[in-house]
UniProtKB/Swiss-Prot annotation:
Organism domain of life: Bacteria
One of the protein's GO biological processes: maturation of SSU-rRNA
This protein's GO CC annotations: cytosol
GO MF annotation terms: ribosomal small subunit binding
NCBIfam families: rbfA
UniProt lineage: Bacteria, Bacillati, Bacillota, Bacilli, Bacillales
Family membership noted in the UniProt record: Belongs to the RbfA family.
Function: One of several proteins that assist in the late maturation steps of the functional core of the 30S ribosomal subunit. Associates with free 30S ribosomal subunits (but not with 30S subunits that are part of 70S ribosomes or polysomes). Required for efficient processing of 16S rRNA. May interact with the 5'-terminal helix region of 16S rRNA.
Protein name (record): Ribosome-binding factor A
Localisation per UniProt entry: Cytoplasm
Subunit organization: Monomer. Binds 30S ribosomal subunits, but not 50S ribosomal subunits or 70S ribosomes.
Gene3D superfamilies membership: 3.30.300.20
Organism: Staphylococcus haemolyticus (strain JCSC1435)
Amino acid sequence: MNNMRAERVGEQMKKEIMDIVNNKVKDPRVGFITITDVDLTNDLSQAKVYLTVLGSEKEVNDTFKALDKAKGFIKSELGSRMRLRIVPELFFEYDESIEYGNKIEKMIQDLHKQDR
């Protein structure tokens, strides 16, 4: 039961964090990001926010620095938007699954080209 609640809260947090980052965080270092998942602990005390960033490695690093700096602001905005007794501690992590999927897709396309 707790696990289902964590999933529901995680989905709502995903939407809210995207809105906060896109509309409220004014740091120019924050690039074009996509939040792919929010993984909450069962007690809702910690949240890993998985995201991808469009851009070079420097832009990715700058975006993560800006998000770490804005973490307190994002957490306070979440607290005002969501009805939670305790707002989870946020940890931003780069989601490598998109890159991995693109790499596999390219390998499959290369195999199809070789077969022709």
